[in-house]
Design a protein with these regions (language model features):
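Short beta-strand His + acidic residue motifs that chelate non-heme Fe in jelly-roll/DSBH
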Residues: 73-75, 93-94, 115, 120-126
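Double-stranded beta-helix
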Residues: 25, 102, 124-154
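Bacterial N-terminal signal peptides
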Residues: 7-18
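Short acidic-glycine-tyrosine-enriched beta hairpin
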Residues: 53-55, 68, 97-118
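A short, N-terminal "cap"/entry segment at the start of jelly-roll beta-barrel domains
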Residues: 20-59, 146-154
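Glycine- and acidic-residue-biased ligand/ion/polar-headgroup-sensing regions
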Residues: 68-71, 78-98
């Protein structure tokens, strides 16, 4: 019985000690602050960084991307794996080098997908759509057709 009581006390102590840490690393929905998405994405989307530095040299990141109805991202690849969870709305995803709406699959809220490095894919939002993306820094978009890259030319 002493061992069980000790285990309970130790667990409670660890839980209490972790509370400040959890509070510093957690966000209620109203605490997520969106701003303009980076220029390598088409205009109109908003982005919130939850964890890490997506543009940093290396490391994990977690972001949320809010897209308006009809928002489209042309076929592209990433050098690292990308994990995507649909939080609201509908994300349509297609595979290949050409944007073809007839070949897209719709994923509603609660859906999860992961895209392996260098996988050719494209996406569109149906209704306002929010996705959470987790991956490795730095985020890079390699558009299949360079003319589709919305990044301002220097």
């Amino acid at each position: 019985m002493k061992l069980s009581l000790f285990a309970v006390a130790l667990t409670l102590a660890a839980f209490v000690a972790a509370q400040p840490l959890l509070a510093q690393n957690a966000f209620a929905p109203d605490q997520v602050k969106f701003g303009p998405a980076p220029p390598f994405l088409p205009p109109g989307a908003l982005l919130a960084v939850l964890e890490g530095d997506p543009m940093g040299a290396s490391g994990d990141y977690t972001i949320r991307l809010k897209m308006p109805d009809g928002y489209k991202v042309a076929p592209h690849t990433h050098p690292y794996r990308e994990n995507v969870t649909v939080l609201s709305g509908t994300l349509k995803v297609g595979m290949g080098d050409q944007f073809d709406a007839s070949k897209m699959t719709a994923f509603g809220a609660g859906s999860f997908a992961y895209l392996d490095p260098s996988m050719h894919h494209y996406a569109a939002a149906s209704g306002e759509t929010v996705v959470q993306i987790h991956g490795m820094s730095p985020v890079k978009f390699n558009y299949i057709n360079p003319a589709d890259d919305p990044t301002p030319k220097k």
